[in-house]
Amino acid sequence: MYRRFFVRMPKKKNVTSVLEVMDITTGQRSVVKEFPFLIEAPNWTPDGNWLVYNSGGKLYKLSPESPGEPQLIHSDYATRCNNDHVISADGKQIAISNGTKEDGRSRIYTLPFEGGVPRLITPLGPSYLHGWSPDGKQLAYCAERNGNFDVYVIPALGGEEKRLTTAEGLDDGPEYSPCGQYIWFNSVRTGLMQVWRMKADGSEQTQMTFDETRNSWFPHISPDGKQIGFHHLYKR
């Protein structure tokens, strides 16, 4: 049984966030917890025991089965975390995108899942994390370099980044397939935002959605690699 999560935010002056999970087979939804403030980007841990989300620049974890008070994931000086964070396949580490105090630009860091001092991975910014390879060796992210946003990869321990896309316009949301052979992403290169797929080395970039009325964003691949979920936004 596959379950997805999402945050529903009613249109009120005072924001209320509703964290829900959904059985994608039956469509049944259930509320995990309501918050009288904004939370974003809940991620399942690989073992399914926790949902990790960001709020107010910090990261928290919450049990979907017995939600009590959320537990803070201590990240030391990294207190400007945005909604781009990913958990490693072994569940031992979490990678975050955090706005640095020096220039406000988002950079990528890693830290133990239980909390700790972050390790800077991308000295250059802005960099927005989206994917972690199944073998734990590479991170995939969207970054702006020289005026264009493209997909990059970098060793998870730090090192030289590699640019994978060169099309004009925004290439964003890269995520590895469970087999590690592909990276899925979204690109506006054909006019509307569409879902694309390429090999992990950047070759064979192939358009996967062809919707003429809606923009398609942020593909997420099911653990068995047989399905993807993504956002649809109607064009204006």
Residue ranges and their predicted role:
Residues M1-R236:
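Sequence signature of WD/YWTD-type beta-propeller architectures
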